[in-house]
Amino acid sequence: MLVLGIESTAHTLGVGIAKDQPPYILANERDTFVPKEGGMKPGDLLKHHAEVSGTILRRALEKANISINDINYIAVALGPGIGPALRVGATLARALSLKYNKKLVPVNHGIGHIEIGYLTTEAKDPLILYLSGGNTIITTFYKGRFRIFGETLDIALGNMMDVFVREVNLAPPYIINGKHAIDICSEKGSKLLKLPYVVKGQDMSFSGLLTAALRLVGKEKLEDICYSIREIAFDMLLEATERALALTSKKELMIVGGVAASVSLRKKLEELGKEWDVQIKIVPPEFAGDNGAMIAYAGMLAASKGVFIDVDKSYIRPRWRVDEVDIPWRN
């Protein structure tokens, strides 16, 4: 089985190709929109994705050394995400499905992150941290679905850090030589400032932390503010994670999503793993951020269980939660 996956939920237009036997991932091509200033504007995302989609599709097919006719199914991330960006991927998927008579497979973006994590880390039964620009979720698989034990009550961890570095003119670009701008700034910081620390059970709130940190700009050294906001945010996440570990008794902790690439977070998680006797499984950097390969792979799993959608019913779902998705391919 060969499945072509299309990702366009936010700043990345990605096309991946997966097959149902090793090495599983045959291609993982993408192009990421980087705004010259400010945040991501939906109209700019739509224009970018529409302009690069054809090129990325061709590159993926060339990388896999196959033609579109060799593909069995078309998988597409229908949500969650930014509406105009989602529509580009959905439109491309529908066009390919109709033109080449290929069945369409609906994929939840978060499930894509989680399933590529299972594949690349070889985790068996983990507690999962799904950390990205749009999501901060603590979950695990139980009785047919991924059940959420904790999540952000407002903005996501990744988004909070992106907004801060943008507001203080440290970004864009957000990632420099594999490091987030807040990590680079934090390297010269050492003073832990007083900032809000909000954990409610296994849920977290980052909006107050962001607001308070921005109010300190000009009053404290920027390096100390970066250091403090990062340390406090990560410690909040770790406290909520420890509670979930105590509740579930899991012996594996899998981290997926763009924030999984953070070296500083990795160090904290390794310490937590030693303390709790838990194996830490972190998705490789090339699959941490948004990508088409994860959509192709999750789509392959879904297709293997007959999960398809009619083209005329393939609506985008900007607020589609991972705990709303049935997972028939997992026992």
Curated annotation (Swiss-Prot):
Cell compartment(s), UniProt: Cytoplasm
Keywords: Acyltransferase, Cytoplasm, Iron, Metal-binding, Transferase, tRNA processing
Cofactor: how bound: Binds 1 Fe(2+) ion per subunit.
Cofactor or coenzyme needed: Fe(2+)
Record-annotated disulphide pairs: none
One GO CC term on file: EKC/KEOPS complex
Main location: cytoplasm
InterPro entries membership: ATPase_NBD, Gcp-like_dom, KAE1/TsaD, Kae1_archaea_euk
Catalyzed reaction equations: L-threonylcarbamoyladenylate + adenosine(37) in tRNA = N(6)-L-threonylcarbamoyladenosine(37) in tRNA + AMP + H(+)
Domain of life: Archaea
One Pfam family recorded for the sequence: TsaD
EC category name: transferase
MF-aspect GO terms: iron ion binding; N(6)-L-threonylcarbamoyladenine synthase activity
Binding site for Fe cation: H109, H113, Y130, D290
Biological process per Gene Ontology, one example term: tRNA threonylcarbamoyladenosine modification
E.C. number: 2.3.1.234
Binding site for substrate: Y130, L131, S132, G133, G134, D162, D183, S262
Listed NCBIfam families: arch_KAE1, gcp_kae1
Task performed by this protein: Required for the formation of a threonylcarbamoyl group on adenosine at position 37 (t(6)A37) in tRNAs that read codons beginning with adenine. Is probably involved in the transfer of the threonylcarbamoyl moiety of threonylcarbamoyl-AMP (TC-AMP) to the N6 group of A37.
Entry similarity comment: Belongs to the KAE1 / TsaD family.
Annotated protein name in UniProt: tRNA N6-adenosine threonylcarbamoyltransferase
Gene name of this polypeptide: kae1
